[in-house]
UniProtKB/Swiss-Prot annotation:
Protein name listed in UniProt: p53-regulated apoptosis-inducing protein 1
Function: May play an important role in mediating p53/TP53-dependent apoptosis.
Gene Ontology BP term (one): apoptotic process
Domain of life: Eukaryota
Compartment annotation: Mitochondrion
Organism name: Homo sapiens
Length: 124
């Protein structure tokens, strides 16, 4: 794994702990990337069966979808957290430009690789 992705992962860790310390009240609103019918805003006909996947991350202590800017649809690599400790293993795109390539068991450590131009998110 390259040092740039490690740095990105560490900065995401720091950003996450900082958000918890400050008690971001708007964090939950950032999870509203799904319309009320529970489907992602991308072409994902076989999306995950559990529509609570985004909301479940809030209860893990760190909001996994903080990084998404809903207005612009862009990602900030400094605050990217995807499915930490949930091990849900999504194989299809579930947000614009984001794909989890491999499922991971619960509690496993992983590093996040982020490409600003092509915008794939990978669990390495």
């Amino acid at each position: 794994m390259g040092s740039s992705s490690e740095a990105s992962f560490r900065s995401a860790q720091a950003s996450c702990s900082g958000a918890r310390r400050q008690g971001l009240g708007r964090g939950d609103q950032n999870l509203s990337v799904m319309p009320p019918n529970g489907r992602a805003q991308t072409h994902t006909p076989g999306w995950v069966s559990d529509p609570l996947v985004l909301g479940a991350q809030v209860h893990g202590g760190c909001r996994g979808i903080e990084a998404l800017s809903v207005s612009s649809g862009s990602w900030s690599s400094a605050t990217v957290w995807i499915l930490t400790g949930l091990g849900l293993g999504l194989s299809r795109p579930f947000l614009p430009g984001a794909t989890v390539l491999r499922d991971r068991p619960l509690g496993s450590a992983f590093e996040l690789s982020y490409d600003q131009k092509k915008a794939p998110l990978r669990l390495q």
